[in-house]
Regions:
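Aromatic (often tryptophan-rich) hydrophobic motifs at membrane interfaces
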Residues: 90-97, 199-304
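Short, Lys/Arg-enriched, disordered terminal segments
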Residues: 1-14, 18, 288, 300-307
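Short, high-confidence coil segments that cap the C-terminus of an alpha-helix
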Residues: 44-46, 101-105, 206, 261-263
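Conserved acyl-donor/pantetheine-binding loop and adjacent beta-alpha core of acyl/acetyltransferases
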Residues: 64-79
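A conserved beta-strand-loop-helix scaffold within acyl/acetyltransferase catalytic domains
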Residues: 4-53, 58-67, 111-243
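Non-catalytic accessory segments adjacent to catalytic cores
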Residues: 89-127
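Short, hydrophobic beta-strand segments that form beta-sheet elements in well-ordered domains
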Residues: 49-50, 104-110, 266-268
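The substrate-binding groove and active-site-proximal loops of carbohydrate-active enzymes
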Residues: 78-86
Length: 307
């Protein structure tokens, strides 16, 4: 990386997407959320900050409301921020200072290499959980907490069976049913994700997993997407009937069994929610911290809008 820090704002139409995606691919902290094709599907609008000749990049995902431009975190996009080599506090601070002033409100997450104490900005920390699958399955299974092992055996005894590579719409339906947010906005997000899934599936970067009960009903499901030696566990859904029979435990175990021994991290995408954090850690997963930032430069008479 050049010793000189020259960060420029690049509007979407002028981004060199080949150089952009190459930067994400080669970055030590590269994540699938940073690729242009991921952002194209999940962000309402996005522009960019670029260091020199795409040595480091930062997507600016934004929207407009009440005439105000604001930065936000897109649906199913857990971490963004600055991607590139040798990211330190000085560089991260410079990127944040380079965000155009027209973005008066910020509320977004950075990534696990962006956790620094900064001179000009306050970052807060969020928890993710990751599990290294580069071990024999028997070793991984022994590291599960006893209650996880017990629920997996229970699901097996009750006739639950894992399935994979089925219609992603079934995953979305179960997830939305669980979230109880079947709104116009959630439907739009779901439609965008279906398009993204088809794109990733064509690249062999996505697959659906599920658990059928003894009546062959789908009681747990999710999507796994792959990039940078990570498998991201997203859009998890759990039918009420599945919660009492260990369906979600069995689903995650099925994926681990299929991928044990590979150079792969299982990325649980969170969570700061205590019960979920305990659940993920019960599989032997460890904490990986990442950063978030909120900034409100709205006029005093508008600050209530984004509270």
């Amino acid at each position: 990386m050049s010793s000189q820090i020259h960060i420029r704002f690049v509007p979407y139409k002028k981004i060199d997407f080949i150089k952009w995606d190459n930067c994400i691919t080669n970055a030590p902290n590269g994540l699938i959320y940073g690729y242009s094709y991921y952002l194209d599907h999940m962000a309402r609008q996005w522009d960019a900050l670029v260091l020199n000749d795409y040595e480091a990049v930062m997507p600016l995902t934004w929207n407009r409301k009440y005439g105000i431009n604001y930065l936000y975190q897109p649906f199913l996009t857990a971490q963004l921020g600055v991607f590139g080599n040798r990211i330190n506090a000085e560089l991260l601070d410079a990127f944040l200072k380079a965000i155009p002033s027209r973005f008066r409100y910020w509320d977004f997450y950075l990534n696990h290499h962006n956790v620094h104490a900064l001179k000009n900005f306050h970052l807060y920390q969020r928890k993710n959980y990751i599990l290294d699958l580069d071990k024999h399955y028997e070793v991984l299974f022994k590291n599960y907490r006893e209650n996880i092992q017990r629920n997996i055996r229970k699901a097996d005894q009750l006739g639950c069976t894992p399935i994979k590579d089925f219609d992603v719409q079934k995953v979305i339906d179960l997830a939305i049913e669980q979230m109880r947010t079947n709104t116009k906005e959630s439907s739009k997000n779901a439609d965008q994700f279906i398009k993204l899934y088809k794109n990733l599936y064509s690249r062999q970067q996505a697959i659906t997993y599920g658990i059928l009960n003894a009546r062959e009903e789908l009681v747990a499901s999710c999507v796994f997407i792959f990039s940078h030696n990570r498998a991201y566990y997203i859009l998890a859904g759990n039918h009420p009937d599945g919660r009492t029979i260990g369906a979600s435990h069995s689903l995650i175990d099925a994926f681990i069994k299929d991928h044990a021994g590979k150079k792969l991290l299982l990325d649980f995408e969170g969570s700061d929610i205590r019960n979920l954090a305990f659940f993920y850690s019960s599989f032997g997963a460890s904490e990986e911290m990442y950063a978030g930032i909120k900034l409100n430069r709205l006029p005093f008479y508008l600050k209530w809008i984004k509270r």
